Curated annotation (Swiss-Prot):
Signal peptide: none annotated. The lineage of its organism: Bacteria, Pseudomonadati, Pseudomonadota, Alphaproteobacteria, Rickettsiales. The keyword Lyase does not apply. Part of the ribosomal stalk of the 50S ribosomal subunit. The N-terminus interacts with L11 and the large rRNA to form the base of the stalk. The C-terminus forms an elongated spine to which L12 dimers bind in a sequential fashion forming a multimeric L10(L12)X complex. This is Large ribosomal subunit protein uL10. Pfam families: Ribosomal_L10. CDD domains: Ribosomal_L10. Keywords: Ribonucleoprotein, Ribosomal protein, RNA-binding, rRNA-binding. InterPro entries: Ribosomal_uL10, Ribosomal_uL10-like_sf, Ribosomal_uL10_bac, Ribosomal_uL10_bac_type, Ribosomal_uL10_CS_bac. GO terms for cellular component: large ribosomal subunit. Forms part of the ribosomal stalk, playing a central role in the interaction of the ribosome with GTP-bound translation factors.
Amino acid sequence: MLRSEKPEVVEEIASIYKDSPSVIVAHYHGLTVSEVNSLRESLKSKDAGFKVVKNTLAKIAANKAGLDDIVSLFSGPTAIVYSKEPVEMAKLVVNFAKSNENLKIVGGIVDKQVLNEHSIKELSKLPSLNELRSKIVGLLQAPATKIAGVLQAPSSSLARVIQANASKN
């Protein structure tokens, strides 16, 4: 890489840090090109990205973006995975790492909070934002359904009492 290109790369990585509330740092040593492309495609379908970064440039960009805490994560062959949706991204990366021993999750950052490998694996077990929204909507609709049932119950009970009375006579 030419010296003149490095500031542009630092700016690109810094903008990724600023625009993406969640970033996972991983070592990719031993991944084949087809495996990396497969991971990129699955991430792209979830509006996430995968970028191989040079450690020194990633550290400079992290400092520039105010993420000094993740500088220590950059060593060895490093890539960053970034997204606006942390849970979906974590699920994809953790599942890929399970099936591919050559991808090692080092750590990451979600909403400016540094996470270690274990925390990212725990994050991947959480429901996604869309799943949470659907559960909340279901919970909000359930009381309305119950209220409708309760309101209908007295009229149907009255009808049964009248029917029972009529059948006695």
